[in-house]
Each structure stands twice: as structure tokens, then as C-alpha cells.
Amino acid sequence: MEKRTSCSVQTSTNCDNSLETLNSAHQATGAVQMRIKNANSHPDRQSQTKSMILTDAGKVTEPISRHRRNHSQHVLKDVIPPLEHPMVEKEGYLQKAKIADGGKKLRKNWSTSWIVLSGRKLEFYKDPKQQALPNVKPRPNAESVDLCGAHIEWAAKDKSSKKSVFQITTASGNEFLLQSDIDFLILDWFHAIKNAIDRLPKNPSFGSLELFSFQRSSSSEQPSHCHIDRKEQKPENRKSFMFRLHHSVSDTSDKNRVKSRLKKFISRRPSLKTLQEKGIIKDQIFGSHLHTVCEREHSTVPWFVKQCIEAVEKRGLEVDGIYRVSGNLATIQKLRFIVNQEEKLNLDDSQWEDIHVVTGALKMFFRELSEPLFPYSFFERFVEAIKKQDSDAKIETMKSLVKSLPPPNHDTMKILFGHLTKIVAKAAQNLMSTQSLGIVFGPTLLRAENESGNVAVHMVYQNQVAEFMLTEYDKIFSSEED
């Protein structure tokens, strides 16, 4: 009886153990099914690796979470703004020649290119239509120059016999020559590219987007260092990445604070007129109005004009092609800068020994006046006067017009044309006739305010007026007190 009872108890115990085993197995199966169901219900998880790894001992290790979707998609998206195409700062046609590729010299071959300056890049196209091609990467026949670490300078004569040429040398050893016959155009390009280079770091690798590269998978966009294999990333690298990420967030907030302070400062700063009245900001000599320059110097003839004329008459009257030959543009710009800064100027200094630099600066001064030497309001009247057929009537009309000019215009004109008559007197040596000087100075001294009419016809009259002023100088300025 006791034996039967113990057997039944043992049987019951075994049954209970079997039931527990079945229940646990059922629960485990249900848990696995639940995990499978949950995994299938989230498509994003399908791309993740298996979370159960079977070791050699046949044991199941703890699940390893490799789900880093929050870091790569949510945090990074808020911190790093989407990349945008850089804004075009300048574009236009220039003559271009590539003379070196990676330090290897190339045969110089000039061609006209449509050049686009944007951010840290200078791009060359055949024409504007090629630049505008949508969604073409890379654009056909387009050449791009990285300005980071580049160097720009005015080209030496051994580089090119053309005038107004500057050279760009990139960090990779490529060399380009850019040129234009229009002085102010090539100057604008030189300063625009130089400013772009100065804004960039000197080290080409610094500032580029090498910190992170974005590697896309089917489920997420994960940031990684350019020089680290994703498969070999260690936990220390992940911590370092998160540190840099939080550091960039603080940098962004710092930049926003600086921007707000700058906006407040700019909104509170005094106006340009106030600064000019206090003498803090002064008008420059080049590019100003003739009356403004004379009023500031308490004279009717600008001091710079007098100095240039004296220098030319001292050592340039017999120089071949005086006023026709162009001087070195970089040296002319240096002279212009000194004059604008009101620094002491000595044109007898050895750096100004080339008389064509002095004449080039004088022509630039008259060309850049905000209103030409012949005022806009007198343009049509001088053109009508030069059209007269009767010589005496033409002289009298010209004389009357010159006499009615404002004192700064009248006195400066008298000194300038008096100087040019001395150039004509030496025409046998310098080969500069009245016609040649008329062509050089006509468009510089006399031009319409709005060139809406025939530019070619205007140019003919401009040259004729300047030439007539030289030919009849004594009669036009006769009976006037010096």
C-alpha cells in the first residue's frame, strides 16, 4: 500500500514536471513567435543583423542591440543641415589658358571660357548654357578648380605677352592664366577670386567635408569617419562620434548667439553720412566726384592730377607711345591704393620709374570719376558744337561751353589739355598725334549718362571733341587769365 502510494506520488510529480516543461516550451515558442511577429510588423528591423548568436558550446548568448537608428537619423538630421549648392558669386567670359597640370608644364592654349566662381570652386564652361544643364554630374567638358590652398598673383611677362593677365596656382599643382582686355573687368575678377581664397583655410584638407561621410543602407543613413572601416568600428569610436556630435551642437548654438549679437551691433551702428560728417570715413580719390575731391583739397585742380602731369613733363614727353601704351596693372593698382589712403606720394621714387604706370594711373583717375570731366549735362551740347561745319562758329561755341563749365571742370580741363599739347609738340619723338590722343582721351573724358543710342557714333564725336580741343587749344582758352 505504501509502495503504491509512493508510486502514484512519483507519477504525479513526473506529470507535473512534464506539464511545466510543456508550458515553458509553449511560452518560449510563443515568445519567439511574438518576436517574429513584432519584427515583421516593423519593416525597419528587417535590415538589422540577427540578435541571437549560437556559440561553439551550443549556448545562446545575450541579444546584442545594433539598432543605432536614433543616432544616425534623428539626432544628426537636426544638427547637420542638408548640403546646398554654393551661391554663385561671380560669372562671366574670360580668356583662359591651363599651363600646368599637377606640376607638369603644358602647352599654353588660350580659349574663351564662361567662368563661374561659387564658394571654394572656380568652374570653367564653354558657355552659360553648359552651366545650366540640369542634373548632369559631372557636366560634360566642365573643369573645376578647388581654391582652397590656392595662390593668385599677376602674371609675369615670361608667362604671357598679353596685358592684364593673372595666374592661379592650386594646391594640387595646376596652373591657370586668366585674361581680359577690359581693365576694370579683370580687376573685378582678380579681387573676387583673391577674396574667395582669403576666406578659405590655407590647408586644403582642412574645412572640407572629410569628418563624416554618409553611407546609406536600405533602412538608415549612418555617419562614419572617412578613414575608418565601418566593420572595424569600436565602442571608443562611437563614443568619440557622439562627443563630436554634441560638440557640433554647442558650436551651432554659439554661432547663433554671435549672429544675434552682430545683428544688434549692425542695427545700432551710425549711418555712413554720420561717419563722413565726423571725418571717420573719407571719400576716396579714385571713383569720387571731381567737385568732392577739389573741395576737400581746397583747390580747383586735384593734387594727384598736378603731380602726374609734372612727372610726365619731367621724364616722359619723348617716350614712344606715351598715354597709348599701358603700364603694369598691378603697379598701377598699388599707386591707386596709396593715393586713396592719402599716404605721402613721391612719383620720383624708383617703384614708379615706368612712366607708363603714371600715365595709366592718370587715365584711370579720369575714367573712374563718378561724373566725367565733361559733365553729363554738357554732353549733347558739345556733340552739337562739333557737328557745326563753320570752323569759326565751332570755335566760338566750344569756347562758350568751356567758359560755362564749373570751376573744377574748367580749370582741370585747361591744365590737362595744355599738358597734352606739349605731348603733341613732341610727336616726332613719341609718335602721338592729336588724332591718337583724341582716341585715347575722348571716351574717357566725354561720355553720355545713358548709352541708349548708337555707341559707335558717340565714340566718333567723343574723339573729335578731344581732338578739336587739342588743335584749337589756344583759341578756346584765349583771353583767359592763368
Curated annotation (Swiss-Prot):
Topology term for the membrane: Peripheral membrane protein
Predominant subcellular localization, coarse grouping: cytoplasm
A GO molecular-function annotation: GTPase activator activity
Classification via SUPFAM superfamilies: GTPase activation domain, GAP, PH domain-like
Organism domain of life: Eukaryota
Keyword tags: Cytoplasm, GTPase activation, Membrane, Phosphoprotein
Modified residues (Phosphoserine): S51, S111, S205, S208, S250
GO cellular component: cytoplasm; plasma membrane
Subcellular location per the Swiss-Prot or TrEMBL entry: Cytoplasm; Membrane
Short name of one Pfam family: RhoGAP
BP-aspect Gene Ontology terms: regulation of cell shape; small GTPase-mediated signal transduction
Site (Arginine finger): R324
Entry remark concerning the domains of this protein: The PH domain is required for localization to the membrane.
PANTHER family: RHO GTPASE-ACTIVATING PROTEIN 15, RHO/RAC/CDC GTPASE-ACTIVATING PROTEIN
Protein's name in the database: Rho GTPase-activating protein 15
